[in-house]
Structures are given as structure tokens and as C-alpha cells.
Swiss-Prot record:
The lineage of its organism: Bacteria, Bacillati, Bacillota, Bacilli, Lactobacillales. Signal peptide: none annotated. GO terms for cellular component: cytosol. This is UPF0246 protein MGAS10750_Spy1880. Belongs to the UPF0246 family. Transmembrane segments: none annotated.
């Protein structure tokens, strides 16, 4: 069985379905540290203006006082990649695929199933904060490595932010799809192409119920197709021709 890892997103939209917010134990220390920060501290940690930091401070305070509601993560996150993932009107098989084989890597919650209920928050591995004297990446590394050991065959749709959270020896069987546009024999890639394609790729995997590495090679989605000559055992390259 294939396991997919996808990143979080800064952009969020509130879904209709909500739950009480239950925070995993490793996240408690992060919440305590974030909630103790002043607006000025948060502005520096996030590299944002103090006005925007006030909103984030309120979110952390609401979590601390257990006032926060939680929403299925794949519905709450609404970045470009998420908007290209099929999230509505799923078949029973597609819903099972999304909730059992797709996991979200978070600097606040750890690695969670795609439908895990989470609260509105702003947090990533670039957030300037120490937890128990460690960087966020060092703090989460044991949990992330344990997940990797339990799920050796991972299809990673993660950004470079996550490259060194996992130890190298845990990623020996990982495959990272790469998405490129071809025009007049020239290949190019950029974040917009990649984000849209990640969502379309995951949707195609769900719709085709891909369970083997070889099944990924026959996928055609949003104009992309597998390119064997550019691909390696650990990087599957998908090309889209541009006019």
C-alpha cells in the first residue's frame, strides 16, 4: 500500500463540519510556548506585522482555553495544492483512500491523517521558536522518523521545508514526484506548476486507486504524463506540454 505525505497550507477556509479540539500530547509543549508569546514576539517569530500577529495570538489563546473548534484538516487547508485535490462528492473508495493513505505533515500537530480534526492556526518549520531547548525540526524528528519506519513506501509531495525533518536513512524507499512544463524542447518548473500538479496527481491516485509504484507511471492528469527518460527510482518526473 502506498502512503502519501502532503504539506500544510497557510490559507484556510472554515468548513461546515466541526468538532471539539483535542490536541496530541507532543503538541502541548508547542501550544504552551506559542500562547506565552507577546504580540511582538509572535510578529518576529512569524516575520509578520504586529496587527496580523494579534489574530494569531487570539487563536493560541482560544486553544489554551479550549474555545477552539476543530475541522477536518484536508477541508480546512485551502492553499493552491488543496484546491486541486478532489475533496467533495467523493466515492466510498476515494474517501477511504484519502483518509487512510494520505497524511499531512505539520509542525504543530506532527503527522496526522488527512481528515484529522485541527484548529485554525499559523505554524510551520520556519517559525522562530525553541521547544524544550530544541528547534522544531529536532523536536519532531523522533516522531517523524517513527512514522517513516512504519510506512517505508512513501510518495512524498512535501516541499523542501521538510527535507531534513526526517533522517536520511528513513527515506530509502521514498519517491518524490516532480512536475515540469515543456515548451519547444525546454523544461521548466516553478511553485505554481508544482502546487497545482501535486493536487491533481493525488486526485488521480485516488480516482484510480493506485496501490503500487508501477501504477503511478500510467497516470495521466491535468495534461501531465510520466516521462521515463527523465525519471529515476526516487524521482518520478511528469511532463505537461505547453503550446
Amino acid at each position: 500500500m502506498l502512503t502519501f505525505l502532503i504539506p500544510t497550507a497557510k490559507e484556510m477556509v472554515i468548513p461546515k463540519e466541526s468538532y471539539p479540539h483535542l490536541l496530541p500530547q507532543p503538541s502541548q509543549a508547542i501550544l504552551k510556548a506559542m500562547a506565552a508569546m507577546t504580540t511582538e514576539d509572535l510578529a518576529k517569530a512569524y516575520r509578520i506585522k504586529e496587527e496580523a500577529a494579534k489574530k494569531e495570538q487570539q487563536r493560541w489563546q482560544d486553544m489554551t482555553s479550549q474555545q477552539s473548534l476543530a475541522y477536518p484538516a484536508y477541508q480546512l487547508f485551502n492553499g493552491l495544492m488543496y484546491r486541486h485535490i478532489k475533496r467533495d462528492k467523493l466515492t466510498t473508495q476515494e474517501q477511504a483512500y484519502l483518509t487512510q493513505q494520505v497524511y499531512i505533515t505539520s509542525s504543530f500537530y506532527g503527522i496526522i491523517p488527512a481528515n484529522h480534526p485541527i484548529a485554525e492556526h499559523r505554524h510551520d518549520f520556519h517559525t522562530r521558536i525553541k521547544i524544550e531547548g530544541q528547534s522544531l525540526k529536532s523536536y519532531w524528528r523522533p516522531c517523524y522518523n517513527q512514522f517513516a519506519k512504519e510506512h517505508p513506501q512513501v510518495i512524498s509531495l512535501l516541499s523542501s521545508e521538510f527535507d531534513d525533518v526526517f533522517s536520511k536513512d528513513c527515506k530509502q524507499l521514498w519517491i518524490g514526484p516532480k512536475f515540469m512544463a515543456e515548451k519547444e524542447g525546454q523544461f521548466k518548473t516553478h511553485s505554481t506548476i508544482s502546487k497545482k500538479a501535486r493536487g491533481a496527481f493525488l486526485t488521480a491516485c485516488m480516482e484510480n486507486n493506485c496501490q503500487t509504484v508501477d501504477s503511478l507511471k500510467s497516470l495521466v492528469f491535468a495534461g501531465f504524463y510520466y516521462h521515463p527518460d527523465l525519471s529515476t527510482d526516487h524521482e518520478f518526473v511528469y511532463i505537461k506540454k505547453e503550446a
